[in-house]
Amino acid sequence: MAEFVRAQIFGTTFEITSRYTELAPVGMGAFGLVCSAKDQLTNQAVAVKKIMKPFSTPVLSKRTYRELKLLKHLRHENVISLSDIFISPLEDIYFVTELLGTDLHRLLTSRPLEKQFIQYFLYQILRGLKYVHSAGVVHRDLKPSNILVNENCDLKICDFGLARIQDPQMTGYVSTRYYRAPEIMLTWQKYDVEVDIWSVGCIFAEMLEGKPLFPGKDHVNQFSIITELLGTPPDDVIQTICSENTLRFVQSLPKRERQPLTKKFKNADPQAIELLERMLVFDPRTRIRAGDALADPYLAPYHDPTDEPEAEEKFDWSFNDADLPVDTWKIMMYSEILDYHNVDAQNGEEVGVPQ
């Protein structure tokens, strides 16, 4: 049994194994608090994420279980990787991952990015997405703050708490508004990996321009801003709208023509604009895929088809439709954590699961 120590961070109790020291707050989200720490075993800096009250409701339990399963499954240079996980005696869950110094949001708010950095960051995002999508996973919440960067400009996609199966009947209100694909706003179902490509397009545009491309004040304003630049959605896209209220809203908007992106991004590389045009497309069926985007001429300095791997196997989503009580999710979580530590336990390492 691992030894646990307690520390107060922002009024929150961090109860972690003695393996981790020198805690310092990094950030807080809706579902958890993240601290940097020193791993005494490896002497490396790590990020420790505390999941707040993971067993308070079945919904939160399932969300945490999903994120844990994804972190265990996804192994790629451009995706954040899990290095440890444990449940404290207070039954909070802690994910330990590699620590990267900053994120794309902080970089974009501090200074304009030069062309070579934009290219390299975009390449790595798409390289990671190609792998994630090939595993049958849609991230659903890509935004600059979910893209971590270190001092060597290595980039990793993080925060898979909202990730879902590739499913033609997805539903729900997901993704930060500025980066949300129009098919989510228009239909709330029938969307797939292309929603992530739209988000990448918005992030790409923000790297080029230095500010968000579609900074909507609310759902309605967001869609209106999109149509000002990209024009009215084509009829075959409008026909896919399932909600009568949404359909009436879209039909009430003035007809608009798509504006050339060269007018919006006057100083950008023409090849960058050509690629952006293929990402910011209303019809997800014609939106470029991650693998094809990697082969675009704009990314030629970095593209290497022999080093852009896909997942070896699809992620197992069999649990995703389960409607289970908290106690069952808890047992499943314990099982996953014990499975993760199985190799370490065989080697005599401590396992952070309370008795």
From Swiss-Prot:
Transmembrane region(s): none
Positions bound to ATP: V26, G27, M28, G29, A30, F31, G32, L33, V34, K49
GO biological process terms, semicolon-separated: stress-activated MAPK cascade
Top EC class of this enzyme: transferase
Coiled coil: none
Active-site residues per Swiss-Prot or TrEMBL entry: D141 (proton acceptor)
Cofactor annotation: Mg(2+)
One GO MF term attached to the UniProt entry: MAP kinase activity
Domain notes from UniProt: The TXY motif contains the threonine and tyrosine residues whose phosphorylation activates the MAP kinases.
Function per UniProt: Mitogen-activated protein kinase involved in a signal transduction pathway that is activated by changes in the osmolarity of the extracellular environment. Controls osmotic regulation of transcription of target genes. Via the transcription factor Msn2, controls the expression of the genes involved in the biosybnthesis of liamocins, glycolipids (also called heavy oils) composed of a single mannitol or arabitol headgroup linked to either three, four or even six 3,5-dihydroxydecanoic ester tail-groups.
Name by which UniProt lists this protein: Mitogen-activated protein kinase HOG1
Source species taxonomy: Eukaryota, Fungi, Dikarya, Ascomycota, Pezizomycotina
